[in-house]
Design a protein with these regions (language model features):
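Intrinsically disordered, low-complexity, mixed-charge
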Residues: 58-66
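Beta-strand-rich, non-transmembrane domain signature
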Residues: 37-39
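Electropositive, glycine-dotted interaction segments
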Residues: 70, 76-173
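Structured loop/turn residues at beta-strand edges in well-structured enzyme cores
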Residues: 8, 67, 124
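Short mixed-charge
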Residues: 47-56, 109-114
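Short beta-strand or tight-loop elements
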Residues: 49-52, 67-71, 95
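Short structured motifs
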Residues: 54-59, 82-86
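Pre-Walker A-like glycine/lysine-rich segment at the N-terminus of P-loop NTPase domains
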Residues: 1-33, 42-53
Length: 173
């Protein structure tokens, strides 16, 4: 579990390469966007902690011990009742958004077949991707609660990416 308290005015993330700075920003972007496509673009295998996956694969591989990914964004009061509630890990009233990725219980039989194989396969494709507000209401990329802009200069490497970047800039204003 990683918890980061941000200042409301300015925050600077400093660290060595591969320390997780971009991962933190990407997680925030994914939750704010409510986009399943973004999750699939990154791939669940890159969002989960590699050590947690390896630890599971080296264990007895019980389906009930499959890791679960949760990203919670606690927000200041947004004057939006849809964001307010206690549907969060602390079960405390607040404003926020939540991404949950967990194995689908309706696919237990198929998942067990994969886990019982000799080779170390993790069943990422049998995970659900769920976006909810702290009120427990589902949301998607079509119903964004907060406008945001995520600039990643490593992705601006083509004419298409540049046009998309400029379009996003104008939409944020």
């Amino acid at each position: 579990c990683l918890e980061i308290a941000f200042d409301e005015n300015l925050n600077v993330l400093i660290g060595d390469n591969e320390a997780g700075k971009s991962t933190i920003l990407s997680a925030i972007d994914i939750v704010l966007s409510g986009s399943r496509n973004k999750v699939e673009m990154y791939g669940l295998q890159s969002l989960f902690n590699k050590e947690i996956i390896d630890e599971f694969l080296n264990s007895s591989k019980e389906i009930t011990n499959l890791p679960k990914l949760e990203v919670e964004l606690y927000l200041n009061d947004q004057n939006n009742m849809n964001l307010e509630g206690n549907y969060n890990s602390l079960q405390e009233s607040g404003h926020g958004l939540l991404l949950t990725c967990e194995y689908r219980e309706d696919l237990t039989k198929e998942i067990n077949e994969i886990l019982n194989q000799e080779e170390a396969n993790f069943p990422f494709e049998y995970y659900s991707i769920d976006f909810k507000t702290f009120s427990g209401e589902s949301y998607t990329g079509y119903r964004k609660y907060i406008s945001h802009l995520f600039l990643d200069n490593t992705q601006i490497n083509s004419e298409y990416a540049t046009r998309k970047y400029i379009k996003t800039m104008y939409q944020a204003n």
